[in-house]
From Swiss-Prot:
Species per Swiss-Prot/TrEMBL record: Mycolicibacterium paratuberculosis (strain ATCC BAA-968 / K-10)
EC numbers, comma separated: 5.4.99.25
Protein's GO biological process: mRNA pseudouridine synthesis; tRNA pseudouridine synthesis
Pfam family, one: TruB_C
Known role: Responsible for synthesis of pseudouridine from uracil-55 in the psi GC loop of transfer RNAs.
Protein name: tRNA pseudouridine synthase B
Record: active site: 40 (nucleophile)
Top-level taxonomy: Bacteria, Bacillati, Actinomycetota, Actinomycetes, Mycobacteriales
Gene name of this polypeptide: truB
Domain of life, source organism: Bacteria
Length: 293
């Protein structure tokens, strides 16, 4: 059995996130592999995977902030808001100045309401939006609040009648960079879509910790053990032996006065459970090492 932990993968272009999971199931010789947030097939970069019991904490990582580097093409709108869709509209964008582009980018920073791209995994009446679009159905998704902490222009260059804009983005979970490209183009009146996307960070995990799939195939290894990952992401509470046994059985403990989810550690340093305070007692978020294990 593979030891439990997290693997930070540098996903190559052309693979779905599920493809990467399938490859890592073979590499680590276990079915218990999952990911903490989908990357589009055209995108590259950070994909956080959980192996064995570490799959239990993946749901807590999906809400982490994300960082991206991307290229937006101004002057063309597409059916998918990225380069994989059909061009729906073309407008000569060569008149755009860097000042106009910077001003439009600034209008998309901070707390905004964003309409997700229709070709997305969001469910509409129990069905994925992208499947409805493929079936020829009209899909209207409601705007939802997201936060754009950084939306910075790193370079501009001509691309025929279009303008390619290299950007870096720090954003909340649930943000669609494709939708940012679409909305930037709309704000400038020329249309826009995403031509390249690389995720550089998910919460505490960045490209500097990422392995390529070929590296992992040659030498399977975790980026972090389960204990290392939990203590990197969450606060820590040290338990007595009796408390550790109780936590391993899912029983409540006295509250610790720690904000949010925290890792509850046995005297030997192993993380027994992730807990959170609710009033005067704790509530188990997930028991990682049950007392019966």
């Amino acid at each position: 059995m593979s030891p439990p932990g997290l693997v930070v993968v540098d996903k190559p272009a052309g693979m779905t996130s599920h493809d990467v999971v399938g490859r890592c199931r073979r590499i680590f010789a276990t079915r218990r592999v999952g990911h903490a947030g989908t990357l589009d097939p055209m995108a590259t970069g950070v994909l956080v995977l959980g192996v064995e019991r570490a799959t239990k904490i993946l749901g807590l990582l999906t809400a982490a902030a994300k960082s991206y580097s991307a290229t937006i093409r101004l002057g063309q709108a597409t059916s998918t808001d990225d380069a994989e869709g059909d061009v729906a509209r073309s407008v000569d964008a060569r008149h755009l100045t860097s000042q106009a582009i910077e001003a439009a980018v600034g209008g998309l920073r901070g707390d905004i309401h964003q309409v997700p791209s229709t070709v997305s995994a969001i469910k509409v009446a129990g069905k994925r939006a992208y499947k409805l679009v493929r079936e020829g159905q009209a899909v209207e998704l409601p705007a939802r609040p997201v936060r754009i902490d950084r939306f910075e222009v790193r370079g501009l260059r001509a691309a025929g009648a279009c303008v390619d804009v290299d950007v870096e983005v720090d954003c909340s979970s649930g943000t669609y960079v494709r939708a940012l490209a679409r909305d930037l183009g709309a704000a400038l009146g020329v249309g826009g879509h995403l031509t390249a996307l690389r995720r550089t960070r998910v919460g505490r995990f960045g490209l500097e910790q990422a392995y390529g799939l070929d590296e992992l195939a040659e030498c399977p290894r975790l980026s972090y053990s389960l204990d290392e990952a939990c203590l990197l992401i969450f606060g820590r509470r040290d338990l007595s032996a009796d408390e550790a046994e109780a936590a391993g059985n899912g029983r409540a403990l006295a509250a610790a006065g720690i904000d949010g989810v925290y890792a509850a550690c046995a005297p030997d340093g192993r993380v027994i459970a992730l807990l959170r305070d609710e009033g005067a007692r704790t509530k188990s978020v997930v028991v990682l090492r049950p007392a019966t294990l």
